[in-house]
Amino acid sequence: TDSVIINNDGAFTVIAGATIDVGCFDDCDGELSVTASGGVPFIGSTSYTYLWNDYLGQNTATAVGLCVDSITLFTFYDCIVTDAAGCKDTLSLKVVQPAELQVDVSITSPISCNGLSDGKLKANVTGGELAYTYTWSNGGATSLISNLSLGIYKVTIEDANTCRDTFEIYLEEPTLVEIDTIFEVDIACFGDNDGYIEVLGTRIC
C-alpha cells in the first residue's frame, strides 16, 4: 500500500504591520508594512514575495518613501504577497498626511499715534499637527504680540511634526500731521513778491 504525506502549512494570511504616515504636507516619507504567515513559504531568506503598487513597485515587506494625494490627504496602497505554491493575497493599506501648514498675520490693534509702541499682531494658523510653536522676529513666542512700534515683523510657525511656515508683515503708524488744505496765491505781476502758499494741517495725535 502506497502512502501519501500531506503537509498542512496553515492558511495563507497577510496582515497589516506598522504604518508611518507622511509628516508634512506634500512630503513623501510614508511607510507601510505587511506580515505574511502560513501557506508554503519559500526556502531561504525570503519566505514570500511582495509587490507594492507604488510608483517604484517595491518588492519588500515594507514600502518606504510613499506619497499622499494632496487633495484627499490620503492614498491607498496595495501589496500582493505570494507564497511558494503561487497562492496570492492582497492587502490594501492607507497612508495619510496633515493639511498644509499655513500662517498669516492680522493687525488686531494698529498703532494709535505716530511714534508710539502700542500695536498688536496675531498669527493665525491652519493645518499641520497640533501643537504649534511661534517664533517672532522681535522675540515673541505666542500667537499674539503687543507693544509694537513701526516696523517689519516676521513669524515662523512649527507644528508637532516640525513642519514650518513663515509670514512677514509691515506694521504702519499714523502720520504726525494730516494736511487739510493748501492755499495758493499767484504773483500778481512780473518781479513782484506778493505770492504765497499757505498749508493748513491737523495734528493727528
Named regions from a protein language model:
Residues 7-14, 22, 96-103, 172-179, ...:
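Extracellular interdomain linker/stem segments of modular secreted and single-pass surface proteins
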